[in-house]
Regions:
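Short functional micro-motifs and their immediate structural scaffolds
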Residues: 2, 16-17
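Residues immediately within or flanking Cys/His clusters that coordinate Zn2+
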Residues: 5
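Short cysteine-rich clusters marking metal-coordination/redox-active sites
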Residues: 8-11
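Cysteine-centered metal-binding/redox modules
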Residues: 21
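RNA substrate-binding interface of SAM-dependent RNA methyltransferases
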Residues: 25-117, 183
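Short amphipathic alpha-helical segments
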Residues: 51-52, 77-79, 124-126, 149-152, ...
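Active-site/ligand-binding-proximal alpha/beta "capping" segment
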Residues: 116-163
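Structured adenosyl-cofactor binding patch, chiefly the S-adenosyl-L-methionine
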Residues: 148-187
Length: 187
């Protein structure tokens, strides 16, 4: 137990420590210049939230707003899954997502709801409006999706095109795909 990280927990062999660097060309996203913020509204799974923190850190999301009953990094399960990413992502808990979104719209943010829906436009067909560089992405509950009032208030309802049999993604997977796409559009 005291040697965890030095020896393999399965076989007991000594581990080799190697330097790990990633230079894949995507490191161009500069957190200081990112105008991408995200709302998680009533996401129930602590593990999904932790995974979302990792993706938010990886793709330089400027801020996460954890709304309603969405778990925060104060919970051990969120911290366990985020693997420390919560220390590098600005976040706050906001009890009312609709009020927050209304404020962001007044501040000039384009409000984009991400949800698997028959009425949603494909994410790949979306383009940023000229002069608009601030985007707020909305992600909803794993079972019930985005609150209808929030959906109605959004500037766009987008979905990730899926070609396989299962027509929906886990919210953490959808978050990762969406923030990668929007980060590349906004950079």
């Amino acid at each position: 137990v005291g040697n965890y990280g030095i020896y393999c927990p399965l076989c007991g062999n000594e581990l080799t420590v190697r330097e790990y660097r990633v230079d894949n060309g995507y490191a161009q996203f500069n957190k200081k210049d990112t105008a991408l913020e995200c709302v998680l509204d009533n996401v129930r799974s602590s593990y999904n939230v932790g995974s979302i923190f990792r993706s938010a850190s990886a793709f330089s999301v400027a801020r996460l707003f954890l709304c309603g009953f969405t778990p925060t990094p104060d919970q051990a399960k969120v911290r366990k899954t985020s693997l420390g990413a919560e220390k590098f992502v600005l976040w706050s808990h906001e009890p009312n997502a609709l009020q927050l979104i209304q404020q962001k719209k007044e501040q000039g943010y384009q409000i984009i709801a991400i949800e698997a829906s028959l009425s949603a436009q494909s994410l790949l067909d979306w383009s940023i409006k000229s002069g608009e560089q601030k985007v707020l992405l909305i992600f909803g509950n794993e079972i019930f999706g985005i609150d209808p009032e929030i959906r109605a208030f959004s500037d766009a309802l987008l979905q990730i095109p899926i070609t396989g049999d299962k027509k929906s993604l886990n919210v953490a997977a959808a978050f990762s795909i969406s923030v990668f796409y929007f980060s590349s559009c906004l950079s």
